[in-house]
Swiss-Prot record:
Gene this chain is encoded by: TMEM185A
Keyword Membrane: yes
Protein name in UniProt: Transmembrane protein 185A
Topology class, membrane: Multi-pass membrane protein
Record's subunit section: Interacts with MAP1B.
Subcellular location field: Cell projection, Dendrite; Membrane
Biological source species: Pongo abelii
InterPro entries referenced in this protein's UniProt entry, alphabetically: TM_Fragile-X-F-assoc
Region (Mediates interaction with MAP1B): 298-350
Amino acid sequence: MNLRGLFQDFNPSKFLIYACLLLFSVLLALRLDGIIQWSYWAVFAPIWLWKLMVIVGASVGTGVWARNPQYRAEGETCVEFKAMLIAVGIHLLLLMFEVLVCDRIERGSHFWLLVFMPLFFVSPVSVAACVWDFRHDRSLELEILCSVNILQFIFIALRLDKIIHWPWLVVCVPLWILMSFLCLVVLYYIVWSVLFLRSMDVIAEQRRTHITMALSWMTIVVPLLTFEILLVHKLDGHNAFSCIPIFVPLWLSLITLMATTFGQKGGNHWWFGIRKDFCQFLLEIFPFLREYGNISYDLHHEDNEETEETPVPEPPKIAPMFRKKARVVITQSPGKYALPPPKLNIEMPD
């Protein structure tokens, strides 16, 4: 495993999102099971931290952009800055939805359709953002997630307000369609991994990459689908599981997603105005990390020392042979000594 490559391709934005979602899901499961009696405003603390980092990072990045006009002429700088602004807009709509959810749970004074209204707005915005990101070759994960689930948001809001009385298994039909597509993606990676394993024309690095991708997708999608099935069955009253066993598959998926951020390139360089890779930024702030990052270990060090200490024997020197008549000195190389040819007397006829 190339640790240097993993940290150079580290995506801090996705790592923060997955870590906050993991901590939030743990707190939510504990709160629903009654193990902790915190307010839901405290349970949502990881979500508030996530949105706070987004707002602060975008504010600092905008300040750096405004104070340094010379940066705007650097390659894809304008594209990255606009992508950051689009992401901030989507996150603000999500923040508004989360605040309304907490207020609705704590006070219960308004309809769920009103609570879901920011998500109804974020879906068309995400569709436009997907088109813009696709044209500029940007990542689309959050935008796609918000845009394809508009029908699911509507069904959930109607079901919570008891406008429709469908079972939750039917309410989540858009979710099952999306998960079916993800299962096809997993099957695609598995088939390609098998083909690459059986092919003799593929180098080992490509085989390893495809196997890693297949295992990653399988570890993400299968537990996530398991969590959704268990949750729907609990909401419909078909099982009496507590929330912690139901959330365990979700935690496994989120941990896998956190692990995949160490091998993903990307990330907007304008968050907090750093304008460079996160790994390089850390090395500039903490120079002592360079010393530990540049250490190399030689596992054959002792053998090399023995080789250096043992003197190499010199080849034996063979004394030169003299021939008096020709006055020529012939020196033989070691291991290649050969007798001189006999003297030939050729008699000339009269």
